[in-house]
Amino acid sequence: MDSVISRNGKPIRLTDERWAHITEEHCELAGLRIEVLETVENPDKVFQGNSEELIAVRELEKGKFLAIIYREFPRDGFIITAFLTRRIKSLSRRKQIWSR
């Protein structure tokens, strides 16, 4: 298990089980575990998710973004899923919580 500190100062966990699930659904993320953690810790932007979750976004290369869905609680939180996208406009329609 790994953890990083979110923009809100909460430790966010990424368990081995969750990482296995993420890479099973999104095989293109295999080998990007460090980048996933770094995106939560040092995102370009954070958006509000559908309910209680947050979406940390970071541009990996020109026009290619890594999006991490995670949940925070009063003491800590955890990563739910992650994906690569080029459709930043669809994420930008959401309420922006934080920006670099």
Language-model segments: residues:
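Ribonuclease/tRNase effector modules and their secretory precursors
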Residues: M1-R100
